[in-house]
């Protein structure tokens, strides 16, 4: 999912972030220079489903190796590295807390040997979940985008892709994955019951185990 920064696209997550986040871009912030292999764009397009799947597969492959080493674990632990997104440490921590409080079959945890990473910078495409040339999954958080929209919602939404959820553009504000559908007044950063149930269902059978089918 990509968060567009164009003023005409305020039908995006569209959440007044200035109050929630303030200025997040350090004066020395450099623009994002890496070229994603695929981007799960914010606005609906024919590329979104494939891009989201590519991102999820990258994470699943990394997690599958860990699950194979500990098949008896009651919950799958997905590890992330937030060191490349220091400006958003609070939002990432909130996203982790939200998801860990909402579901029980999968846990998000910061640590080494990460399954995916968070990054920050400037990008005209806004924020998005993607994969790099080596197939590793990452979430990119754009400075201007996270001033324009509610930063915790943006971060928690993007993290929802890690857990297997696609974008649902026509959904209401109560759906975390609804993207730009609800308009600028929506500040909800919590998954709804259907989203929680879907994540639980996916990971109850070990979403990571399904990675064997896409290797």
From Swiss-Prot:
Species per Swiss-Prot/TrEMBL record: Streptomyces coelicolor
Q: Which InterPro entries match?
A: MetalloPept_cat_dom_sf (IPR024079), Peptidase_M7 (IPR000013)
Q: According to its UniProt record, where is this protein located?
A: Secreted
Q: Which cofactor does it need?
A: Zn(2+)
Biological process, per Gene Ontology: proteolysis
One annotated Gene Ontology cellular component of this protein: extracellular region
**Cystine connections:** 173-186
**Signal peptide: which range, if any?**
1-30
Q: Which residues hold Ca(2+)?
A: 152
Q: How is the cofactor bound?
A: Binds 1 zinc ion per subunit.
The EC number of this protein is 3.4.24.77
> What is the protein name for this chain?
Extracellular small neutral protease
The UniProt family comment states: Belongs to the peptidase M7 family.
Instruction: Give the reactions, separated by semicolons, that this protein catalyses.
Output: Hydrolyzes proteins with a preference for Tyr or Phe in the P1' position. Has no action on amino-acid p-nitroanilides
């Amino acid at each position: 999912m990509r968060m567009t920064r164009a003023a005409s696209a305020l039908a995006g997550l569209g959440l007044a972030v200035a109050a929630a986040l303030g200025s997040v871009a350090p004066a020395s912030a450099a623009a994002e220079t890496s070229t994603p292999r695929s981007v799960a764009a914010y606005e609906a397009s024919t590329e979104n489903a494939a891009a989201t799947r590519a991102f999820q597969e990258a994470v699943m492959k990394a997690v599958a190796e860990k699950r194979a080493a500990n098949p008896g674990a009651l919950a799958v632990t997905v590890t992330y590295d937030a060191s490349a997104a220091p400006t958003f440490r609070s939002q990432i921590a909130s996203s982790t807390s939200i998801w860990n409080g909402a579901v029980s079959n999968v846990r998000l945890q910061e640590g080494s040997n990460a399954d995916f990473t968070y990054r920050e910078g400037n990008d005209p495409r806004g924020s998005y979940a993607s994969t790099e040339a080596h197939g590793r999954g990452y979430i990119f958080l754009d400075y201007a985008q996270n001033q324009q929209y509610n930063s915790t919602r943006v971060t928690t939404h993007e993290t929802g892709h890690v857990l297997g959820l696609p974008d649902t553009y026509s959904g209401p504000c109560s759906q975390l994955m609804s993207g730009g559908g609800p308009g600028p007044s929506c500040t909800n950063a919590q998954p709804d019951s259907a989203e929680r149930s879907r994540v639980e269902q996916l990971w109850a059978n070990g979403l990571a185990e399904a990675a064997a089918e896409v290797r």
